């Protein structure tokens, strides 16, 4: 072989190696929560396809169930093998603030600041977090969508029990008694079915349980932290409010008004019980319950009869509503949870990761993604809330009305240690103390407050 031939092969080999390396650098690893239904995932896939076509970057997408996302991400952080971009429905509740504090997240201010004015109040602010390693606050996450608490009930089950929607009380105590003391026994007597008045999430491994409980707490006007994140748990009014909320919440189980299994429910389980008509009503932090039937109605793989029944369920038989008035008679208050994605400080391809996040948060890309969830998530941008989508049916109008009336934020947006409180789920553990260990409500609250002080003080 001639020297020139050898040189040519060496050059060719070097170019091939360089090309392979360059190609490898143009891959982006993305981890994402799997959607509740097909249309939600399809909307994500479409956004990814558009980004790939625009950028030439190949996205390697991995999707996981909501309950698996945090364990998998924590394991990746420990192993030093993090994805470039990650999103989970419960990051905001349990880990985003802690990761920011520990210096594990990339500063996204260059992406967020130029478009800050397009976001609704109490949305982008929740991603402005303290990094104790860098000793600064910055935008360490990106907001995608938000949720709040709703009531869902079966109109036909209510009617079968002999009641109309106009008979549903608006007062706090009367409202919960109505489903437990009137609807449940009447429905069982009329139908012979052992259905329950309420689906009441109480599982320690469920974000629904603490979101629902905190909504009860809000109606008792309890504030656990001030605007600077300082604990207010030594205020006697806080303890009394928590006692009222915990008693009301656990009384539903004590009266036999929720399935016994609800003490160990995970996030999808109250949905499943509702869809099976095991429960007449449930509270849920999105309208995924109603939207599931809309997704079925649009599912070409189902029979015409199944699709017709799904459409009837969505249009006629399921109602989305707000909570009753507070115990003091004032209007209910709703806390919004802003769903956050992150880029890790240890990500291998941060430049392309930031390009993807910037692309996804553009109005033309974010809005179709949010609407792909069929109303399960509410927008974080002002313009998206004005679209006809949110006036298209009674479920979406109800969601829109709740958000436009104004919402409040979670404690972890002011004190990151409440992500640890929520991750430990001291709220559901207090429920368990009352229900399973038979301790008085006041004792369970005292123990809960002591634990909150130990974690977040």
Predicted regions and their residues:
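Conserved C-terminal helix/tail region of periplasmic/extracytoplasmic solute-binding proteins
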Residues: 27, 58-59, 159, 251-254, ...
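Long, aromatic- and glycine/proline-rich binding clefts that accommodate carbohydrate-like moieties
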Residues: 122, 126, 134, 312-323, ...
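Short, solvent-exposed loop/beta-turn-alpha elements that line the ligand-binding surface or hinge
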Residues: 107-122, 168, 188, 196-204, ...
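Glycine-centered hinge/linker elements that transmit conformational signals in sensory
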Residues: 176-184, 227-263, 319, 323
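Extracytoplasmic/periplasmic substrate-recognition and gating elements
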Residues: 25, 49, 54, 79, ...
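Extracytoplasmic/periplasmic solute-binding protein
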Residues: 131-144, 149, 173-232
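Hinge/lid segment of periplasmic solute-binding proteins
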Residues: 91-153, 209, 221, 307-323, ...
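Extracytoplasmic "Venus flytrap"/periplasmic binding protein-like
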Residues: 26-29, 46-126, 159-162, 167-170, ...
């Amino acid at each position: 072989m001639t020297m020139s031939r050898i040189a040519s092969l060496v050059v060719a080999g070097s170019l091939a190696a360089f090309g392979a390396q360059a190609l490898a650098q143009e891959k982006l690893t993305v981890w994402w929560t799997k959607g509740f239904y097909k249309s939600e995932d399809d909307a994500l896939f479409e956004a990814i396809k558009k980004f790939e076509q625009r950028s030439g970057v190949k996205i390697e997408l991995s999707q996981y169930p909501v309950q698996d996302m945090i364990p998998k991400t924590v394991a990746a952080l420990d192993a030093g093998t993090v994805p470039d971009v990650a999103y989970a429905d419960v990051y905001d509740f349990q880990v985003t603030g802690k990761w920011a504090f520990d210096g594990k997240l990339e500063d996204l201010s260059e992406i967020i600041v130029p478009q800050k004015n397009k976001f609704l109040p109490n949305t982008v602010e929740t991603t402005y977090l303290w990094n104790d390693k860098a000793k600064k606050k910055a935008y360490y996450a990106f907001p995608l969508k938000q949720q709040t608490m709703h009531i869902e009930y079966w109109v036909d089950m209510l009617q079968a029990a002999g009641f109309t929607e106009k008979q549903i009380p608006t007062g706090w105590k009367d409202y919960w008694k109505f489903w437990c003391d009137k609807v449940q026994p009447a429905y069982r007597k009329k139908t012979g079915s052992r259905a329950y008045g309420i689906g009441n999430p109480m599982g320690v491994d469920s974000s629904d349980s603490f979101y629902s409980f905190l909504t009860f707490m809000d109606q008792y006007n309890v504030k656990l932290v001030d605007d600077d994140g300082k604990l207010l748990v030594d205020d006697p009014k806080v303890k009394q409010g928590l006692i009222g909320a915990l008693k009301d919440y656990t009384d539903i189980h004590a009266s036999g008004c929720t399935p016994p299994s609800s003490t160990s429910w995970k996030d999808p389980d109250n949905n499943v019980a509702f869809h099976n008509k095991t429960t007449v009503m449930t509270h849920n932090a999105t309208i995924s319950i109603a939207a599931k039937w809309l997704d079925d109605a649009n599912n070409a793989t189902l029979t015409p009869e199944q699709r017709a029944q799904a459409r009837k369920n969505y249009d006629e038989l399921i109602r989305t509503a707000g909570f009753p008035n507070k115990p003091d008679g004032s209007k209910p208050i709703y806390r919004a949870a802003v769903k956050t994605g992150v880029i890790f400080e240890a990500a291998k391809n941060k430049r392309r990761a930031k390009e993807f996040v910037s692309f996804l948060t553009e109005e033309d890309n974010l809005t179709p993604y949010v609407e792909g969830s069929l109303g399960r998530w509410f927008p974080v941008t002002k313009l998206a809330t004005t679209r006809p989508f949110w006036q298209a049916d009674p479920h979406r109008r109800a969601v829109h009305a709740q958000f436009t009336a104004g919402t409040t934020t979670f404690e972890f947006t002011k004190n990151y240690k409440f992500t640890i409180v929520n991750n430990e789920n001291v709220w559901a553990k207090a429920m368990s103390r009352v229900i399973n260990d038979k301790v008085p409500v006041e004792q369970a609250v005292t123990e809960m407050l002591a634990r909150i002080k130990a974690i977040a003080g």
